[in-house]
């Protein structure tokens, strides 16, 4: 979606990802160049940043895989970020680096007064958040124009099996963000000079601010699953979901176009379509 958005506005795009990835719909398309490589390998990173005007850094080892091997996670998420910064400082010093971080870096804020603001201290609850905090520090120190985006959990309106245990408590504050709104935020961060040098929360906004129980109840009602079957994260286990201050990010990027209600409507339509097939 991000590539399509860039191309739709007339920008040429270079996609850099692992050789094992599926590049269908990208390779051979006008205005799209595919570079296969690994961010832990400096030579291919140097090749990837040649002649670019902006970099969207999305590459990372994500949970749950990131929790299995700390060294591998830090090698990819932190050392990979170092390689991108060094390559840009050497070959693309005028290009903007937009770094995709996470609201999980705030740690457990359940006992605090919402919303969580970007000035809030960061406390890693897992290796992934640890890697993002370390990478943010590197990005802030880079001799480049940079943007830090701390992104909330992403909601995609497609039919998925509920997880065995939802990763939040029933009472926990929860604010996610629609996938297409994330794409809009990412794209606009690349082309909006006013956001350079800033750290911004990217989340759904007031219509998405709900509780863990209500979020699950809404989904189970659409899926036709009895709410008695739900299992939430234990009360004694720390978690990072909350409500977020997105006033500045919305003012600068104008990305919150899909309300929570519209997301539920799209999900319901998807379920009805699948049942009709």
Regions found by a protein language model. Give the residues of each.
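Conserved Rossmann-fold NAD(P)-dependent oxidoreductase catalytic core, especially the SDR/UDP-sugar
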Residues: 79-125
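Glycine-rich NAD(P)-binding loop of the Rossmann-fold in SDR/ketoreductase-type enzymes
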Residues: 40, 68, 72-83, 122, ...
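Catalytic helix-loop patch of NAD(P)-dependent Rossmann-fold dehydrogenases
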Residues: 75, 110-148
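Glycine/proline-rich active-site loop of Rossmann-fold NAD(P)-dependent oxidoreductases
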Residues: 133, 156-167, 188-200
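Substrate-positioning beta->alpha
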Residues: 148-150, 167-190, 198
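NAD(P)H-binding glycine-rich loop region in Rossmannoid oxidoreductase-like domains
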Residues: 32, 36-76
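Mid/C-terminal beta-alpha module of Rossmann-like enzyme folds, strongest
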Residues: 185-246, 251-252, 263-265, 271-275
